[in-house]
Swiss-Prot record:
Pfam families: Syd. This is Protein Syd. GO terms for cellular component: cytoplasmic side of plasma membrane. It is found in: Cell inner membrane. Keywords: Cell inner membrane, Cell membrane, Membrane.
Length: 184
């Protein structure tokens, strides 16, 4: 049975790609990802890569849990392993964000290292564990997944200040509005 997060992520991605194609007449594009190998690459032109989502290859995120001896919330793995894609700009109510996605196998390894670093910082500051999902325009805030409850939060980096955006990642993805703008 397909995980609900996988289905919700695929549905959001379809809406994102459709909006991009309607507004720009082409696949989503990125200057920041130009020249970086990925199964997503459709073609490159003028220092820009055009991409489409591609299915993940069965990777997991268990390295994060093993590194810190914690059990990851079950919603996290499908969010990052369902597909390869470029980061996607979106809006949730008034908050604009860049949804973090995995571009390649190498990018997945980098993501895991960054998540471990995030969790180590939280442990050092005695904060409950979260895992980042998206960056925001405000460099001090990010959208995260609470590893204990599975809620999606707007979190101030290094602070206990957190606001619940959605009770589940599936609910969050269903309410997220795609913005056909280049990320990065």
């Amino acid at each position: 049975m397909e995980h609900q997060v996988s289905a919700a992520l695929r549905e959001f991605t379809q809406r994102y790609v459709a909006q991009w194609q309607q507004q720009h007449g082409d696949w989503p594009s990125s200057h920041a990802l130009y020249g970086i190998p990925s199964p997503c690459v459709v073609y490159s032109r003028d220092d820009c890569v055009f991409w489409r989502p591609e299915p993940g290859r069965g990777e997991d995120l268990e390295g994060i849990g093993r590194a810190l001896d914690i059990r990851l919330h079950p919603a996290l793995a499908p969010f990052f392993t369902t597909q390869y894609a470029g980061d996607m700009r979106a809006r949730w109510n008034e908050i604009e964000m860049d949804l973090v996605q995995v571009w390649s196998v190498e990018d997945l390894h980098r993501l895991q290292e960054n998540q471990i670093g995030h969790l180590v910082t939280q442990r050092r500051l005695k904060l409950s564990p979260t895992l980042f999902l998206a960056s925001t325009a405000d460099e001090l805030s990010m959208v995260t997944l609470c590893n204990l409850s599975g809620s999606v939060l707007l979190e101030q980096f290094g602070s206990p200040q957190r606001r619940v955006l959605a009770q589940t990642l599936t609910e969050f993805l269903a309410e997220l509005q795609p913005l056909a703008q280049e990320v990065g």
